[in-house]
């Protein structure tokens, strides 16, 4: 019988600078939003509001919204979670299954509930204190994924809660909310000496290989777009940007993309340093092909899980 959660690693051997390029791209571009826009609507539990919001912010939502990975990474979609739970003599705890989970279409602000796996019942979130009939503890809260714009349109779609209470509590806390996009990487990725390794968690209730492919496809597209948009200044080197002096053949490296690409073509560069290098050796299309081949190799390795 397969365990509901398994830790695995996906390993591929690549040219070291290409492996580093993919690792750095993954860490900088593959950003899964946290639930940092949280509003407590009612709380008579022994945990204070800040404790609830901190715990909810870091709920591992990718294993719940796995059908929407690509659109969440491109920020076409966001999501929210909602909890309304009262203590009873029979049920004295809260699990992740007690939440309702909704996907948000950012074009229309439509809010759609998604199915939740029954396995979430095994993930304990909170235990109430001893039950007393006359002082039953309750908690009601809602949390949106980072980057969600809270406006009248989206609030009108929250038909499962008291909008008046929501507006009051949201107005009380919105000035102290972090306006920045807050996220985490879905996996830890390392690349020592070209050994690109993804440390992943595989769950029994969905097709991890399909989800991993969505992530790698997103990463490949984002990296190729960044390569096409990347520029190296030609002329005198001024140590503010990566630049190349064709007269002296000196290259100043000041960003990770330049460093990894020129190293792929034989330069032994480091950040914020000068190197004598023939820039004509760089073939961008050849590098992109190597990147695409590497992504195929990564997906092939993931299929062996």
UniProtKB/Swiss-Prot annotation:
<comment type="function">
    <text>Part of the DNA-dependent RNA polymerase which catalyzes the transcription of viral DNA into RNA using the four ribonucleoside triphosphates as substrates. Responsible for the transcription of early, intermediate and late genes. DNA-dependent RNA polymerase associates with the early transcription factor (ETF), itself composed of D6 and A7, thereby allowing the early genes transcription. Late transcription, and probably also intermediate transcription, require newly synthesized RNA polymerase.</text>
</comment>
<keyword id="KW-0548">Nucleotidyltransferase</keyword>
<protein>
    <recommendedName>
        <fullName>DNA-directed RNA polymerase 35 kDa subunit</fullName>
        <ecNumber>2.7.7.6</ecNumber>
    </recommendedName>
</protein>
<keyword id="KW-0597">Phosphoprotein</keyword>
<keyword id="KW-0240">DNA-directed RNA polymerase</keyword>
<dbReference type="GO" id="GO:0003899">
    <property type="term" value="F:DNA-directed RNA polymerase activity"/>
</dbReference>
<dbReference type="Pfam" id="PF03396">
    <property type="entry name" value="Pox_RNA_pol_35"/>
</dbReference>
<keyword id="KW-0808">Transferase</keyword>
<dbReference type="GO" id="GO:0044423">
    <property type="term" value="C:virion component"/>
</dbReference>
<dbReference type="InterPro" id="IPR005059">
    <property type="entry name" value="DNA-dir_RNA_pol_35kDa_poxviral"/>
</dbReference>
<keyword id="KW-0804">Transcription</keyword>
<dbReference type="GO" id="GO:0019083">
    <property type="term" value="P:viral transcription"/>
</dbReference>
<comment type="similarity">
    <text>Belongs to the poxviridae DNA-directed RNA polymerase 35 kDa subunit family.</text>
</comment>
<keyword id="KW-0946">Virion</keyword>
<dbReference type="GO" id="GO:0003677">
    <property type="term" value="F:DNA binding"/>
</dbReference>
<dbReference type="GO" id="GO:0000428">
    <property type="term" value="C:DNA-directed RNA polymerase complex"/>
</dbReference>
<comment type="subunit">
    <text>The DNA-dependent RNA polymerase used for intermediate and late genes expression consists of eight subunits 147 kDa, 133 kDa, 35 kDa, 30 kDa, 22 kDa, 19 kDa, 18 kDa and 7 kDa totalling more than 500 kDa in mass. The same holoenzyme, with the addition of the transcription-specificity factor RAP94, is used for early gene expression.</text>
</comment>
């Amino acid at each position: 019988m397969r365990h509901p959660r398994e830790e695995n690693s996906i390993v591929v051997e690549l040219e070291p600078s290409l492996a580093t390029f993919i690792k750095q791209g993954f860490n900088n571009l593959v950003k899964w939003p946290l639930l940092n826009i949280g509003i407590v609507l009612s709380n008579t539990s022994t945990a204070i509001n800040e404790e609830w919001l901190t715990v909810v912010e870091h709920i591992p939502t990718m294993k719940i919204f796995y059908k929407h990975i690509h659109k969440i990474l491109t920020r076409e979609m966001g999501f929210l979670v909602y909890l309304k739970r009262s203590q009873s003599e029979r049920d004295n705890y809260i699990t992740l299954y007690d939440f309702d989970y909704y996907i948000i279409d950012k074009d229309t602000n439509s809010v759609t509930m998604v199915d939740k796996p029954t396995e979430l019942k095994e993930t304990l979130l909170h235990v109430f204190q001893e039950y007393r009939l006359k002082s039953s503890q309750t908690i009601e809260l809602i949390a949106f994924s980072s980057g969600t714009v809270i406006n009248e349109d989206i609030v009108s779609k929250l038909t499962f809660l008291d909008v008046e209470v929501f507006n009051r509590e949201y107005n009380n806390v919105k000035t102290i909310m972090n306006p920045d996009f807050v996220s985490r990487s879905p996996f830890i990725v390392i690349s020592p000496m070209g050994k690109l390794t993804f440390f992943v968690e595989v769950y029994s209730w969905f097709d991890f290989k399909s989800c991993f492919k969505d992530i790698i496809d997103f990463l490949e597209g984002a990296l190729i777009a960044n390569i096409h948009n990347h520029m190296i200044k030609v002329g005198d080197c001024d140590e503010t940007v990566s630049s190349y002096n064709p007269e002296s053949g000196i290259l100043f490296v000041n960003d990770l993309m330049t460093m990894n690409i020129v190293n792929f073509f034989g330069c032994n560069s480091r950040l914020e340093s000068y190197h004598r290098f023939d820039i004509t050796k760089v073939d961008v299309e050849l590098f992109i092909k190597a990147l695409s081949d590497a992504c195929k190799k990564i997906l092939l390795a993931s299929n062996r899980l």
